[in-house]
UniProtKB/Swiss-Prot annotation:
Cellular component per GO, a single term: cytoplasm
Protein name stated in the entry: Selenide, water dikinase
Record keywords: ATP-binding, Kinase, Magnesium, Metal-binding, Nucleotide-binding, Selenium, Transferase
Cofactor remark from the record: Binds 1 Mg(2+) ion per monomer.
Cited InterPro entries: PurM-like_C_dom (IPR010918), PurM-like_C_sf (IPR036676), PurM-like_N (IPR016188), PurM-like_N_sf (IPR036921), SelD_I (IPR023061), SPS/SelD (IPR004536)
Superkingdom of the organism of origin: Bacteria
Active site: C13
Keyword tRNA-binding: no
Classification via CDD domains: SelD
Keyword Metal-binding: yes
Organism expressing this protein natively: Lachnoclostridium phytofermentans (strain ATCC 700394 / DSM 18823 / ISDg)
Length: 340
């Protein structure tokens, strides 16, 4: 792998503000009142949705962050795939994207060219058009996209809406944050990084298109708040989810690195925010860290009727990405999340 970006500190979605700090600020922002704003920021959804006609709504999102890999082209691909993912988590289709660039004035512009090339290729793969962007000089590289998509107003996937007996399905393996952390200190194997990069550069477009054929009750993508943080947002303290940890897909090496305490500060922020809602029926430390691990360009997490779960899983297996039925929803218990 070509190594040209050598300052990967807290890159990817590990760079996000912690959920507790973010909630503290957003709770003080007045909520917009417009009947055509179908999804705003009040529900922790992945993107905003605004209705422009009876049949069409626009989906808007943006995401950018510092590098988590040292190859600029791959970084561009990952950052773009991550930004595009929010449209797919809502059930929409990508139409246009704008580059968001922070770049040091004294750095080789060829590096920026490689980042933008990687990003553009993912936008094209998504079926979208790169239509422009904005750049500023900064001490560190940061890159991402502002993305616009479309969706039918009656077919939006929200992150709320789970129902008792629903099955929870995850479409990508966990552990990329832990592996990137291990790589920054020279402890990750090439095989582990290859697995992480394959996951992070895979668009959620394909999984989203599959699950739209079914009755999806709630959906989100797993990113900086980790699986348990995003699951907490889905449950809204109204239901309980039972997670079968042995059914959760993850990259094997991430488990080994977690046992060696190669874990992220962002993962610990996620643990601190969510842990009071959790009951552990297993003392597997490494698995706990994987469940809290911030993901960059992570998979879709969705709830669905139990009778559809196995058929959806069969369809998803055709994408050749580890996925699984990881748990189920039940009426609210003493704790919101139970880990078995």
């Amino acid at each position: 792998m070509e190594k040209e970006i050598v300052f990967c500190k807290g890159g990817g979605c590990t760079a996000k503000l912690g959920p507790e700090a973010l909630k503290h600020v957003l709770d003080k922002i007045p909520k917009a009142k417009d009947p055509n704003l179908l999804v705003g920021f009040e529900g922790s959804d992945d993107a905003a949705v605004y209705r422009i006609s009876d049949d069409v709504a626009i989906v808007q999102t943006l995401d950018f962050f510092p590098p988590m890999v040292e190859d600029p082209y791959i970084f561009g691909q990952i950052a773009a795939a991550n930004a595009l993912s929010d449209v797919y988590a809502m059930g929409g289709d990508v139409k246009t994207a704008l580059n968001i660039v922070c770049f040091p004035e004294k750095m080789d512009l060829n590096i920026l060219g490689k980042i933008l090339t990687g990003g553009n290729e993912k936008v094209m793969e998504a079926g979208g058009i790169l239509a422009g962007g904005h750049s500023i000089a900064d001490v560190d590289v940061k890159y991402g996209l502002s993305v616009t998509g479309t969706i039918h107003p009656d077919r939006i996937f929200k992150n709320s809406g789970v129902r008792p007996k629903d099955k929870l399905i995850l479409t990508k393996p966990l552990g990329v944050g832990i592996i990137a952390t291990a790589d920054r200190v020279g402890e990750a194997s090439e095989e582990a990084m290859d697995k992480a990069i394959k996951s992070m550069t895979t668009l959620n477009k394909y999984a989203s298109e599959i699950i739209r054929k079914y009755d999806i009750h709630a959906c989100t993508d797993v990113t900086g708040f980790g699986l348990l943080g995003h699951l907490h947002e889905m449950l809204q303290n109204e239901y309980t989810a039972v997670i079968q940890s042995k059914s959760v897909p993850y990259i094997k090496e991430a488990y080994d690195y977690a046992n060696e305490f190669l874990i992220t500060a962002a993962g610990q922020r996620n643990r601190n925010f969510v842990e009071s809602f959790i009951e552990y029926e297993t003392d597997d430390f490494a698995m706990q860290e994987i469940l809290f691990d911030p993901q960059t360009s992570g998979g879709l997490l969705f709830s669905v009727n139990p009778e559809d779960a196995n058929k959806i899983l069969e369809d998803l297996h055709g994408l050749e990405m580890p996925c699984g039925i990881i748990g189920e929803i039940m009426e609210l218990q003493e704790k919101e999340i139970i880990i078995r």
